[in-house]
Structure formats: C-alpha cells, structure tokens
Amino acid sequence: MAITKTSATFVLLIILAASLSNFNVLASDIKPTGRIDNQCKRMCSATYGNGKCAADCRSDGFSSGQCFTSPPFDNRCCCNN
C-alpha cells in the first residue's frame, strides 16, 4: 500500500510541476500568406494581358499570375505563390 501511495504522490507531483512550467514548447513563427506574398512588378496593357502575365509569372517560379486593374494594383501583373 505504501508503494501505491508513493507512486501516486510522485505522479501528481510530476503533473503539478508540468502544469506550473512557464516554457512554451509548442510556439512557432507565423509566416504571412496571401497578398503580402504577391509580386506585382510588370504593367499590363492591350498587348500584355493575362496570358502573357501568367506565362511570365510561371517562368519566374510562381504558380500563376493575373492582371489587376483595381486600386491599389493599378493595372499591374501580380504573380501568386
């Protein structure tokens, strides 16, 4: 019986110590996604449209690209990761 009480006390002390610990072991960096990763370098025009924009973006290593005409993009080819 003494061994059971001792082991139960020991387990409870370990649980108490773990719950009072200030270490944040599961923390990790949060990396932004979405528009912040977009690249809008080229200007779109009547001769440089969505097709050429997407092709240039893919050749630059992005997954896709499209011409955006609304502010704040102001008719630019934006490449997406």
Swiss-Prot record:
Family matches, as InterPro entries: Defensin-like_dom
Residue stretches in coiled coil: none
Signal peptide interval: 1-27
Predominant localisation class: secreted
Stated family: Belongs to the DEFL family.
Species per Swiss-Prot/TrEMBL record: Arabidopsis thaliana
A GO biological-process term: defense response to fungus
Disulfide bonds: C40-C79, C44-C67, C53-C77, C57-C78
Keywords: Antimicrobial, Disulfide bond, Fungicide, Plant defense, Secreted, Signal
A single Gene Ontology CC term: extracellular region
Cellular compartment(s): Secreted
Name the record gives this protein: Defensin-like protein 45
The organism's place on the tree of life at top rank: Eukaryota
Entries under Pfam families matching the protein: Defensin (PF24552)
